[in-house]
Amino acid sequence: MLANQPDHQIDKQDRIRAAVEKNPRKMTLQLACDLGVPEVEVIRAFPADRVTELDVGRWEELLRSLEPFGAVRVLVSNGAATIEVDGQFGGFSTTGEFFNVQTDSLDMHIRWRELGAVFAVEKPGHMNGMATRSIQFFDQTGAAAFKVFLNFGGPIAPESETRFAELRAKFKCSVSGQMAHQLR
């Protein structure tokens, strides 16, 4: 923890870390709601071996690097609903403020200027505890923009595990999240 952080901030971070440790399988959105914090703060509280902050400034290259994974599960949530879609990244284009992903199985229009953080996450699944691998994008308020699960409820294919590790190393953020956000 940083010496120049106010005590209430350190207490909040400790509270979030304790909740993550106590409930490793709980959905991060639910933990964030329970704790009254943005979901990105829950992700940042994960143990270092389970989360890597990626360089959000390289968002387009990162999104394009998801195509070789083949079929993935994309989750998008807002205050009223969550949608889960199985599809493949590809068909990339830019129109106005949108970066588009348009394939036969996935149709996304991403307001890339709103992206604030992105992470490579390893987490026990909330349903069966099986380890999941995901790339999770957050907006500038700390809410999840969308999450891309490389496996969901089943084992990850060995080649996807290798690609995930390579992606995590290639896009790893060289500055802490809050600083990276301020530098953009």
Predicted regions and their residues:
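Eukaryotic intrinsically disordered, low-complexity regulatory linkers and tails enriched in Ser/Thr/Pro
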Residues: 1-184
